[in-house]
Regions:
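N-terminal accessory targeting/assembly segments
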Residues: 1-103
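Short, surface-exposed secondary-structure boundary micro-motifs
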Residues: 20, 34, 72-73, 91, ...
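Short beta-alpha junctions and helix-cap segments that line functional grooves
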Residues: 27, 39-41, 54, 69-73, ...
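Short, compositionally biased
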Residues: 43-49, 80-91, 142-166, 184-199
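Short histidine-centered loop motifs in beta-beta connectors
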Residues: 54, 59, 119-128, 159-167
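P-loop NTPase nucleotide-binding/switch module
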Residues: 97-140, 145-152, 169-229, 244-247, ...
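P-loop NTPase catalytic core
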Residues: 221-222, 228-545, 549-552, 564
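C-terminal amphipathic alpha-helical interaction region
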Residues: 539-585
């Protein structure tokens, strides 16, 4: 019999219940008020008193209202039909809901029960299978989706029967399994999984090493991220976090893209809803939305649903990773999620940590980032979740707890800087403060040596050193004046500016410059390094400035030209002639 409870106190969206039976941590309950049923999650149990966070507005909720517990945690429903869907944090299909505003207590089924899917069996009767083993395959938007043994299945099962190739709905039984005790299990295309529990149906989780191409030079060349890697993008308002995220999600070499708009302003979420269906996937020429799932929770929705939205997104990503797919998960922004945690922690009168965030913020963030990664599945195939979260620190302060704690766990750090954004140097990633720890991995070094060449990482470290040196000289020139430093210093400074303008800066709105393939990035890097190694002859600082401005202009025109086209080669020849003109004899 289901446990029941009665409301004994309400503080905003935290409700205290007195219960008449056993209740588990993170269990879901429904509180009845005025004909609506409000979904809530247990966050603390003290004897017969239970604290729950409500995922809806608690306006009008009174002491004495009835609550009924479901006996399960917050779960997502997984199966074919999720691609190109827009969900909220509780996996309600937003397209099925009526009206401009979401109504309280209204829940929709996330999948389409009526659609038929063409099923192709991969297993046969008599096969031994375990949890997450592939039984068959359906195609959705040209993506091969696997139908798997239920994730919670224990031990080894035998396939008793499996349907032949044909069209079936998600609720049709496609296979019958027999477990070790002889019990029959009917399997359809639907899976359920609690969002707070990580899926561990894989053989091993090695260190990731394969470069994830994004087409963004400041990432791929200078601070690369790998398939199954983690990164985060902190930056104050107006520095281009969202544009950079859009560029990565559009261009990255991933099979599935999941966007969790968690606590963003409503206008930004609407922008995602209207822009993404229009974006063309550069890899397939089809609409990017066909392989994208958007999970939206705006800042004016109840805070508890923000927390649910990031976990829902990660669980859906783990589902696709179990199929051997490469998933890219973008969360915008994890700061709003941390603020939701802070709000609940404060309402429960827990001991506050720095800036009143919960004391266990560090472990919550690290556990969440730890769910991403590159895995080898039980059948030897590989899958990955690459997770990139944005952080919106208050006032652009990168020393606040969310940024500091994320820095400990994310291996890539792309610091967006107000100063670079003000100078219109986009993407406004600070090349000196940003880093990628994957460059230090021997596995990654070996991969890059085979994929590109053995000198690549040495060259990348050289341009970072030159950028640092250029910054130091710029400060000296500011203090001492142009005449106060030697001409050689001006040359070093302008060589660092060449690296900045040609490699780091990129036009996200130009068709050619927006996406730079690795082959082209290699040529740009080699070209810039060769120029930096060349000694030039100058008499005064004005000559240095005029000469390098001409050079930067030609290189910029090359970036806007199609790779290896006549126009590109023409500019390349002009550049070579210009270099010869001033070469020190």
């Amino acid at each position: 019999m289901a446990t029941k409870g009665t409301v004994s106190g309400v503080i905003a969206n935290m409700v205290t219940l007195v219960v008449d039976g056993p209740v588990a941590q993170n269990e879901i309950c429904y509180i009845s008020t005025g004909g609506d049923k409000l979904m809530a999650e247990v966050i603390k149990v003290v004897g017969t008193q239970v604290y729950v966070q409500v995922f809806e507005s608690t306006r009008g909720l009174k002491v004495g209202a009835e609550a009924e517990f479901t006996g399960h945690m917050l779960e997502v429903t997984l199966g074919p039909g999720m691609l190109s869907k827009n969900y909220d944090g509780l996996q309600n299909d937003l397209d099925k809901m009526d009206g401009v505003f979401l109504k309280r207590g209204q829940y929709t089924y996330p999948l389409d029960k009526g659609s038929k899917w063409h099923f192709v069996p991969l297993a046969k009767a008599g096969d031994k299978v375990e949890a997450a083993a592939w039984l068959g395959q359906v195609d959705e938007n040209f993506q091969p989706l696997k139908i798997m043994v239920p994730f919670e299945q224990k031990g080894v099962c035998t396939v008793k029967s499996i349907v032949k190739e044909g069209d079936y709905t998600i609720e049709d039984t496609i296979a019958v399994l027999q477990d070790e005790e002889g019990k029959e299990i009917k399997v359809n295309m639907i899976q359920k999984w609690p969002v707070k529990r990580a899926m561990t149906n894989y053989r091993e989780k090695p260190r990731p090493f394969k470069l994830l191409e994004t087409g963004v030079r400041v990432i791929d060349t200078v601070n690369p991220i790998v398939e199954g890697g983690t990164g985060f993008i902190p930056g104050p308002f107006g520095t281009g976090k969202t544009v950079l995220q859009h560029a990565i999600s559009k261009q990255a070499e991933a099979d599935i893209v999941i966007i969790a708009a968690c606590g963003e302003r409503a206008n930004e979420v609407v922008e995602i809803f209207t822009e993404f269906p229009e974006l063309v996937d550069p890899h397939t020429g089809r609409k990017l939305m066909e392989r994208t799932i958007i999970i939206a929770n705006t800042s004016n929705m109840p805070v508890a649903a923000r927390e649910a939205s990031v976990y829902t997104a990660m669980t859906i990503a783990e589902y696709y990773r179990s199929m051997g797919l490469k998933v890219l998960l973008m969360a915008d922004s994890t700061s709003r999620w941390a603020q939701a945690l802070r709000e609940m922690s404060n309402r429960m009168e827990e001991l506050p940590g720095p800036d009143a965030f919960p004391m266990d913020l560090s472990s919550i963030i690290s556990n969440f980032y730890g769910r991403a990664g590159y895995v080898v599945l039980n059948n030897g195939e590989t899958g990955s979740i690459t997770f990139i979260g944005t952080v919106s620190p208050a006032g652009g302060n990168l020393k606040e707890p969310v940024t500091e704690n994320t820095k400990k766990v994310a291996r890539c750090f792309y610091a967006l800087e107000q100063d670079r954004a003000d100078k219109k140097r986009y993407p406004a990633v600070n090349p000196i403060d940003s880093y990628s720890k994957y460059i230090e991995y021997p596995e990654f070094e070996n991969y890059i040596a085979q994929r590109i060449n053995g000198e690549w990482i040495g060259k990348v470290n050289e341009i970072k050193t030159r950028l640092q040196r250029g910054k130091e000289i710029a400060e000296q020139i500011n203090i001492l004046g142009d005449d106060g430093v030697p001409v050689e210093y001006h040359e070093i400074f302008w060589k660092s500016e060449l690296i900045d303008f040609v490699i780091l800066q990129q036009d996200a709105f130009d068709e050619i410059d927006a996406v730079t393939p690795m082959e082209r990035q290699e040529e740009i890097l080699n070209m810039v390094i060769d120029i930096c190694h060349t000694d030039f002859a100058f008499d005064n600082f004005n000559e240095v400035m005029d000469y390098f401005k001409k050079m930067i202009n030609i290189c910029k025109q090359m970036n806007y030209s199609k790779f290896q086209s006549d126009e590109y080669n023409q500019f390349h020849q002009q550049l070579m002639d210009l270099v010869e003109e001033r070469k020190a004899k």
